[in-house]
Amino acid sequence: SLRSVIHFTPTDFEMLYLRSDLYENDREQARKAKRSFVDNERLGFDSKETYRGLETDPDSEPDIGTYEFTIRVFSEGFISRVIVGDQGIILTTDGLDLASFETVAIALRVLLKEL
């Protein structure tokens, strides 16, 4: 199930959702804890440019397609990141199957494009 939703840019972030049983529902404590995740996921702004360049590089992995989203797997949950332009969304979850991650990522990409 969904644990948290964070909107972020290269310079700031906002927690849009926090499941009530986490961090004793203390949003400030959660924000402090999530800062390290956000700082790490901001690296995606740079790596996205790298992956975009690989799309046109004839020496890169053939037919790998366009970068869409990132999933990080932990023993007790997942972090998923979607970046469009200069903003992104991080989701933390207890678990989802891969098809559900992809469905959510597509929806988030559409939403971010509209912002």
Sequence positions of predicted segments:
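Non-catalytic interaction/Regulatory regions outside core domains
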Residues: S1-L115
